[in-house]
Amino acid sequence: MDAFKTHLATVASGAALSREQARAAFDDLLSGEVTPIQAGAFLTALSVRGESEDEIVGAVSAMRARMLPVTAPTGAIDIVGTGGDHSGSYNVSTLAAILTAACGVSVAKHGNRAATSRSGAADVLVALGVKIGLPPEALARCLSEAGLCFMFAQTHHGAMRHVAPVRTELPFRTIFNMLGPLSNPAGVTAQVFGVSRPAWAEPLTRVLATLGSRRVWTVHGSDGLDEITTTGPTAVIALEDGALSHFTIDPREVGLPLATLDDLRGGDPDHNAAALSAVLEGARSAYRDIAVLNAGAGLVVAGAAGTLAEGVARAQGAIDSGAARATLARLVAVSNA
């Protein structure tokens, strides 16, 4: 543990670790060989200074090396966010994932139970009847038969148990809040990736590029949502074959009305499951609008739509045809088989 103490002294001094040093430090953290006091001091020092891109790359590499992997079809994507926007919005990315899968794109959704909201992806899917915590072979079957799977973070990142008590004791978010969304167990290389802090957007996009992602839209709503919002514009950093570009999405430009944050607010898992089901049954609402907007982005990132407007139209069609409702029904059936 002398090496970890050296890394701890480095970050405590305000200096940054190299990519290799960060990988070694997080290997130690995730192995359970670091004391709680050392772990807390290390995570606090990183948070106070702000994590460098090399430190994040090293940390993600350590996470990915320990995760339980899932085999996914070529071209599978994820729609995921860092969380932590404290908006209380309903499960936008979960519904967007269902709509995207209903349009023929494999979605390997990675998520967890609620951290700062009342209902995380895992919570609402359980309320809808989906069995979570499945082994990799069952998840591969979900992808094959339903076009969609849900990879429960606690199942795939067991090493996180070593730092969970320390994270619970710290009254602020740490680097681990961004590591989960960057560590998809299916190894997808295309993502719609929401961030709750605008300062994270470009660095984390570059991190994904360094780690092999091919096509990414990193999004942050003007209202703070870690989604493409319908209350106003959303800033997007797009990664395409190693190059980054910046643009803004206005929902009105793809035929969707503006909403308020109150319109998008959710509740507990049962409330959100009922709202999601209503959208799949054809209900017109702000919930539907933001879901088709984010699904449209997923289709563009997957290469299944040439423009956002085309993607939104396809997502609308998946609801109206009943394909999205059928996709969820298949996921429920296959996950419980």
Swiss-Prot record:
Pfam families: Glycos_trans_3N, Glycos_transf_3. Mg(2+) 2 binds at residues 226-227. Binds 2 magnesium ions per monomer. Its EC number is 2.4.2.18. Anthranilate 1 binds at residues 81, 112. GO terms for biological process: L-tryptophan biosynthetic process. 5-phospho-alpha-D-ribose 1-diphosphate binds at residues 81, 84-85, 89, 91-94, 109-117, 121. One of its GO terms (cellular component) is cytosol. Pathway: Amino-acid biosynthesis; L-tryptophan biosynthesis; L-tryptophan from chorismate: step 2/5. Keywords: Amino-acid biosynthesis, Aromatic amino acid biosynthesis, Glycosyltransferase, Magnesium, Metal-binding, Transferase, Tryptophan biosynthesis. It is an enzyme of class 2 (transferase). Belongs to the anthranilate phosphoribosyltransferase family. This is Anthranilate phosphoribosyltransferase. It comes from Methylorubrum populi (strain ATCC BAA-705 / NCIMB 13946 / BJ001).
